[in-house]
Amino acid sequence: MSRYRGPRFKKIRRLGALPGLTSKRPKAGSDLRNQSRSVKKSQYRIRLEEKQKLRFHYGLTERQLLKYVRIAGKAKGSTGQVLLQLLEMRLDNILFRLGMALTIPQARQLVNHGHILVNGRIVDIPSYRCKPRDIITVKDEQNSRTLVQNLIDSSAPEELPNHLTLHTFQYEGLVNQIIDRKCVGLKINELLVVEYYSRQT
């Protein structure tokens, strides 16, 4: 299944706010309609919608998300929390959380086009897994820095999660540590996502 490229507002109207996909928010009226429908939802549909919420927020294909679930299942600790850590530590998501991009798809473009360096080397793989003490910088070229500066100026000021530090004037971000569960930027029940996949096998 390919990455979603359809109308974004259609997705947030059904699934709720997906800040990684779009900065738009569902209207209050649409929330009420969804709540009235939710009474009739089956447990399967509830799990499916949580899975879809995760997939669309992080901009993943079904195959990519399944791969992350399998990796998380083999790791020590809670599968759901490890899954969120894996997704949050992707380079495209780190750029989004630093405020260097307005959405994760936008951050992915920055990476794909060679504007981003990790520890002094260009990384053009959006799924690159960042680690504590990684230094993320914008390429030292005018078009790269102007592009990112415009995105920083356009983004609404938000408090950075404690696992990240941003030095705006140096166009530099620092990964301090693995993200805490409480700092994940999406309202999600990750256990339902794990349950969804466990029932598919």
UniProtKB/Swiss-Prot annotation:
One term of GO molecular function: structural constituent of ribosome
Keywords: Chloroplast, Plastid, Ribonucleoprotein, Ribosomal protein, RNA-binding, rRNA-binding
Main location: plastid
Annotated localization: Plastid, Chloroplast
InterPro entries assigned to the protein according to its UniProt record, in alphabetical order: Ribosomal_uS4, Ribosomal_uS4_bac-type, Ribosomal_uS4_CS, Ribosomal_uS4_N, S4_RNA-bd, S4_RNA-bd_sf
Keyword Ribosomal protein attributed: yes
CDD domains on file: S4
S4 RNA-binding domain residues: 89-152
GO cellular component: chloroplast; small ribosomal subunit
Gene3D superfamilies the UniProt entry points to: Ribosomal Protein S4 Delta 41, Chain A, domain 1, RNA-binding S4 domain
GO BP term, pick one: translation
Family designation: Belongs to the universal ribosomal protein uS4 family.
HAMAP family: Ribosomal_uS4_B
General function of this protein: One of the primary rRNA binding proteins, it binds directly to 16S rRNA where it nucleates assembly of the body of the 30S subunit.
Subunit structure: Part of the 30S ribosomal subunit. Contacts protein S5. The interaction surface between S4 and S5 is involved in control of translational fidelity.
Name this polypeptide is given: Small ribosomal subunit protein uS4c
Organism per entry: Crucihimalaya wallichii (Rock-cress)
Gene: rps4
